[in-house]
């Protein structure tokens, strides 16, 4: 008993010393961590080739564990994002990718959850890199209005940051975004929207009515091909252009769980939420449908994203699938 009291007393003393010195301890930890944090560049760890990472795998429903749709594509020296949902830019930085190194963004469509991180992305790229021109944003017809709106909303901020930091950090020539529109390809056709250094980025029309235009993107580089579906119902077009590819990144929504949410909303008298839950399944693919598309096309790997609803309880992923 006496020995136990001695051990407990020593432990309490150590805890007290640690608490009193917490600022010093934190300073030393930061001194060790900051060089690694600020000096990390994930691109330097990748082999030459075509690479994918998710900086956001969720949809519009709020969740502490999921961000809006955001896909990183690395092709040789090129670094792209497909869509920029909320928190995507911050996750991109947490993954160790250089915000100042982003070459362009490709938008699949203009639903809020796919574009609401654009302003933050443009600001972070501008203020942390050495770019001298705005961030190019490729998208189907209508992208010009979206980009003009973001630039207008952030125009005061551009001035504030330039006045504070000057041209070294925030040159006005690089502030904001610039739209690069393209015509949505006809049904069943591909349109090349970017081609450089052995990389081809092709757009395809997808089925997300009443949302129009809506596209997916196919990236081909170094003998590898991946296709990002964007938001779409199950579609033969996806399967046709995904035939034999290495990776299909496909959105998915669980109609069973959405149905449970609709029934619950009805029981609570929440007609608005019930109507939303009734509406959304008809322009998304289910996990099973996405898997069927991948199987029938002979895809090497399938990666789900735009996971709806968010996975919030243990075991829910099994129900979602």
Each language-model region and where it sits:
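Binuclear metal-dependent hydrolase catalytic cores
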Residues: 2-226, 315-321
């Amino acid at each position: 008993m006496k020995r136990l009291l001695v051990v407990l007393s020593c432990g309490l003393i150590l805890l007290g010393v640690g608490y009193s010195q917490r600022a010093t301890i934190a300073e030393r930890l930061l001194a060790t961590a900051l060089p690694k944090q600020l000096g990390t560049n994930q691109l330097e760890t990748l082999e030459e080739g075509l690479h994918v990472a998710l900086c956001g795998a969720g949809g519009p429903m709020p969740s502490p564990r999921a961000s809006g749709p955001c896909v990183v594509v690395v092709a040789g020296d090129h670094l792209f994002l497909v869509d920029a949902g909320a928190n995507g830019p911050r996750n991109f930085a947490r993954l160790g990718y250089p915000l100042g190194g982003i070459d362009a963004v490709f938008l699949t469509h203009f639903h809020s959850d796919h574009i609401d991180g654009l302003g933050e992305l443009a600001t972070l790229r501008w203020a942390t890199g050495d770019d001298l021109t705005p961030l190019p944003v490729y998208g189907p017809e209508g992208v010009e209005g979206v980009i003009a709106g973001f630039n207008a909303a952030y125009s005061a901020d551009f001035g504030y940051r330039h006045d504070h930091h000057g041209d070294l950090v925030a040159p006005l020539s690089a502030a904001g975004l610039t739209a690069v529109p393209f015509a949505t390809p006809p049904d069943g056709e591909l349109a090349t929207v970017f081609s450089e250094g052995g990389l081809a980025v092709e757009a395809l029309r997808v089925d997300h009515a009443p949302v129009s235009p809506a596209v997916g993107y196919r990236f081909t580089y170094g003998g590898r091909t991946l296709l990002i579906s964007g938001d779409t119902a199950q579609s033969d077009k996806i399967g046709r252009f995904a035939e034999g590819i290495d990776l299909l990144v496909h959105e998915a929504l669980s109609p069973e769980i959405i149905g449970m949410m609709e029934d619950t909303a009805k029981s609570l008298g929440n007609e608005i939420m019930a109507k939303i839950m009734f509406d959304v399944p008809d322009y998304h693919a289910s996990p099973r449908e996405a898997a069927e598309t991948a199987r029938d096309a002979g895809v090497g790997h399938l990666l789900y994203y735009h996971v709806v609803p968010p996975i919030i309880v243990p075991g829910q992923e099994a129900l979602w699938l």
